[in-house]
């Protein structure tokens, strides 16, 4: 996927197909980099964390629920470091672009997720 707004965590590639027959089948979603995705490290907005911990053994409840519903996970998104911010600015990964107002920050610790949806990178 081409990330035109800097919403996805750099250097990551995450794709997990959802259940084929769920009510969300055909929809895509991204997960904030605070949610565990089985087989992938959870960085929490800090580039050093993934190298110092094992990949997640299972999906976070929210991620698994969306997958069980049929949605397909297509990436992990930037967050303020350890989700401690209100602007969506990450000194390590950069600030995602606010498609609706490029001269303004996307805002909130879920800025990467919001930027991804606004830019059409995913549905949810």
Model-assigned labels for residue ranges:
Residues 1-124:
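Gly/Ser-rich catalytic/binding loops embedded in alpha/beta enzyme cores
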């Amino acid at each position: 996927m081409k990330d035109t707004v800097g919403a996805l965590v750099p250097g990551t590639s995450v794709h997990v197909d959802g259940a084929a027959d769920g009510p969300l089948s055909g929809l895509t979603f991204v997960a904030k980099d605070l949610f565990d995705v089985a087989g992938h490290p959870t960085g929490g907005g800090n580039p050093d964390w993934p190298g110092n911990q094992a990949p997640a053994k299972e999906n976070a409840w929210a991620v698994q629920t969306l997958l069980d519903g049929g949605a397909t996970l297509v990436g992990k998104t930037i967050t303020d470091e350890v989700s401690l911010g209100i602007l969506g600015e990450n000194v390590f990964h950069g600030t995602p672009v606010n498609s609706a107002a490029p001269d303004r920050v996307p805002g909130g610790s879920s800025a990467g997720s919001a930027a991804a949806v606004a830019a059409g990178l995913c549905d949810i």
